[in-house]
């Protein structure tokens, strides 16, 4: 089998709608049989069916697991997760028919976590570990192939990188509490998988206090923003709505809880007490359909969750003063049955060996070899060969030896040839090469040096790329529904190319240089386009000095994004008030710029100290329903910016009450009534339009940004 034949085979999977936009691992009869055998059930066994679809067999699940890049040992876990998804009680339709970007959040407990080497420590939500990356991807490919999403049904307004994969193992060995699954009646020695119908989680940074009350009240604020009261497609979920809060507590925070004598039950009780809003505050953001609001006085306290047991407290992640907080509408947990152990031979071919693969299985062995040596973020790659790489260099319009930039974690230059190799591995089209090279030049430029340094910190910073102008349409970069993923090949593979360049050439090896406490699914890649034709205000890039007809790129080194869901607000001010709230929660007052080097050696480099406080930018991506509300009201981009700025202040007293008294946003002499902004001016809010027709907006805070016009536009 020639390299060209292998690439053609992968192209066939794309054309048949069997991919999420990135290369898959091809299926062979022998490998499919091994995967089925590892599951301990016959291939024809029926597991259930998604609504309105054909029955799902074990063989179908095995094929999805193979395509995703799973090893056979993962099959019992994947099968059990599918059994949960296929249970009629599970609101599976929310995962692909909802506008709200729901995804299956997978939590693994018990011995199988260590057996499969599922990550539970640094970068647990991000790239770097094959098991985490491929198990979640197997579920996504199953939803695509067996439930008809996204090609024939995913109506997600904006999508989410977490829809590609979200698999977390609990760090039972370093937890102050008993493993989560024991609270559901399982033994510690049982292996279990929990699947939640979740929406995008939020990282909470608090490095300025060790008091449990301060930390938990900051978590509660994220769980109580007005967006938590969105109706969440209840009709799709029918009777299955049973809201849960998932709190993934990283090492530093759980150590503070342990030292203060707080167990899980005490944490749950406190969280239930402080997680909620006054009815008037919820109405002020335009939310009205929640039955608990009907007839309630404005000062009535409305809890978000029904009881203490709805707060699922999990130990995972490394040091860095952070935790990940998320919500879900349903959760189910099941024991993973023991299954036959299937011997998996070590890769026969490895990087750098002289190899002449003759068969499909030879190629798969070589791909396994690349992945085993850390040349992938966890997903299958295309094999780089001289002809393919040469074609990509030629398509870039540059010489292979041309220098793209320099990384602080690599001694030599990064060249066009380096970029071409990784773009090919990522599955990128040769048509995308000029854009990928331009992105990498901007990525490694002095303009974004602070971002490159912060990208190796515990904070989890990552590049967000926005493509402007005619080139976005010419290359098919998605600016509509589900633009943040999955499904759009250009978005997926261009973003993945950048991540592979960072890992393989830039030196950002996960858990070696990239020390993210929790990581983020957006670290796999984030490339989007602006829907300029739908914008009431014209494109965004003229704001950065370009002409509307220019093609350009904007790069933001960003922290964790917030997804604001609001299907009820019909007026401008309630809508924007909810968006501003998600940009100004208390954790925004703690950042790498909130300390000096003597306080945190792992945060961004010395040149960034304090800069986040005055230089932070907000990218605001307005989905269809939200931009139409603004269009009908005749609001200009400048009016939106001014409103968001006016509503991005918190009082000094609020900061002190939640443990942020030493934040450099504050000075000791300031009165508690003094109001302090997160963003220092209306021009810091960059408002653009994209996405489908639902009521969703994505907001993200950026440490630094840079822009570049593309040649040949």
Regions found by a protein language model. Give the residues of each.
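Loop-centered beta-sheet repeat module
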Residues: 140-199, 499-558
């Amino acid at each position: 089998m020639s390299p060209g034949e292998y690439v053609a085979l992968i192209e066939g999977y794309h054309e048949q709608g069997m991919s999420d936009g990135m290369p898959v691992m091809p299926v062979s009869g022998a490998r499919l049989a091994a995967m089925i055998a590892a599951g301990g059930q016959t291939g024809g066994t029926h597991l259930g069916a998604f609504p309105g679809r054909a029955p799902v067999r074990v063989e179908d699940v095995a094929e999805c697991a193979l395509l995703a890049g799973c090893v056979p040992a993962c099959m019992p876990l994947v099968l059990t997760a599918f059994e949960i998804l296929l249970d009629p009680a599970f609101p599976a339709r929310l995962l692909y028919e909802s506008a709200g970007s729901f995804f299956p959040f997978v939590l693994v407990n018990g011995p199988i976590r260590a057996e499969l080497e599922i990550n539970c420590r640094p970068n647990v939500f991000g790239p770097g570990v094959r098991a985490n990356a491929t198990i979640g991807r197997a579920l996504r490919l199953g939803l695509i192939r067996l439930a008809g999403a996204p090609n024939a049904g995913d109506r997600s307004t904006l999508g989410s990188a977490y829809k590609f994969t979200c698999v977390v193992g609990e760090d039972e060995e370093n937890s102050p509490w008993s493993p989560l699954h024991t609270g559901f009646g399982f033994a510690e020695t049982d292996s279990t998988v929990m699947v939640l119908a979740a929406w995008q989680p939020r990282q909470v940074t608090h490095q300025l206090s060790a008091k449990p009350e301060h930390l938990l009240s900051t978590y509660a604020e994220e769980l109580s923003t007005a967006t938590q009261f969105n109706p969440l497609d209840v009709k799709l979920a029918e009777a299955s709505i049973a809201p849960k809060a998932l709190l993934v507590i990283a090492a530093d925070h759980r150590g503070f809880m342990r030292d203060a004598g707080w167990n899980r039950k005490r944490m749950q009780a406190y969280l239930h007490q402080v997680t909620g809003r006054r009815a008037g505050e919820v109405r002020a953001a335009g939310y009205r359909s929640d039955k608990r609001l009907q007839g309630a006085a404005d000062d009535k306290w409305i809890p978000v969750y029904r009881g203490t047991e709805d707060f699922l407290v999990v130990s995972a992640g490394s040091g860095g003063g952070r935790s990940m907080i998320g919500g879900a509408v349903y959760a189910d947990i099941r024991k993973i049955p023991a299954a036959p152990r299937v011997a998996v031979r070590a890769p026969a071919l490895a990087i750098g060996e002289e190899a002449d693969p003759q068969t499909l299985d030879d190629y798969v062995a070589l791909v396994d070899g690349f992945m085993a040596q850390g040349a992938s973020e966890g997903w299958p790659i295309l094999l780089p060969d001289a002809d393919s790489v040469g074609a990509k260099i030629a398509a870039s319009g540059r010489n292979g030896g041309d220098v793209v930039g320099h990384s602080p974690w690599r001694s030599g230059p990064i060249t066009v040839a380096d970029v071409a190799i990784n773009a090919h591995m990522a599955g990128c089209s040769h048509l995308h090469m000029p854009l990928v090279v331009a992105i990498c030049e901007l990525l490694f430029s002095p303009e974004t040096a602070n971002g490159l340094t912060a990208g190796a910190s515990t904070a989890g910073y990552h590049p967000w790329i926005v493509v402007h102008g005619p080139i976005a349409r010419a290359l098919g970069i998605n600016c509509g529904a589900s633009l943040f993923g999955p499904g759009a090949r250009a978005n997926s593979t261009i973003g993945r190319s950048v991540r592979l360049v960072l890992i393989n050439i830039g030196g950002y090896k996960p858990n070696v240089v990239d020390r993210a406490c929790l990581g983020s699914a957006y670290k796999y890649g984030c490339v989007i386009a602006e829907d300029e034709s739908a914008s009431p205000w014209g494109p965004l890039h003229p704001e950065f000095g370009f002409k509307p007809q220019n093609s350009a790129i904007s790069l933001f080194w960003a922290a964790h994004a917030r997804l604001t869901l609001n299907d009820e607000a019909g007026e401008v001010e309630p809508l924007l008030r909810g968006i501003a709230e998600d940009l100004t929660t208390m954790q925004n007052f703690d950042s790498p710029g909130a300390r000096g080097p003597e306080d945190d050696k792992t945060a961004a480099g010395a040149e960034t100290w304090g800069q986040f406080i005055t230089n932070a930018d907000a990218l605001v991506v307005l989905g269809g329903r939200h931009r139409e509300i603004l269009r009908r009201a005749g609001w200009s981009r400048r009016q939106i910016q001014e409103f968001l700025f006016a509503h991005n202040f918190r009082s000094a007293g609020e900061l002190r009450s939640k443990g942020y008294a030493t934040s450099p946003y504050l000075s000791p002499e300031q009165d508690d009534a003094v109001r302090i902004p997160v963003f220092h001016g209306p021009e810091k809010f960059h408002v653009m339009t994209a996405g489908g027709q639902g009521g969703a907006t994505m907001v993200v805070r950026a440490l630094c940004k840079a822009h570049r016009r593309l040649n040949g536009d």
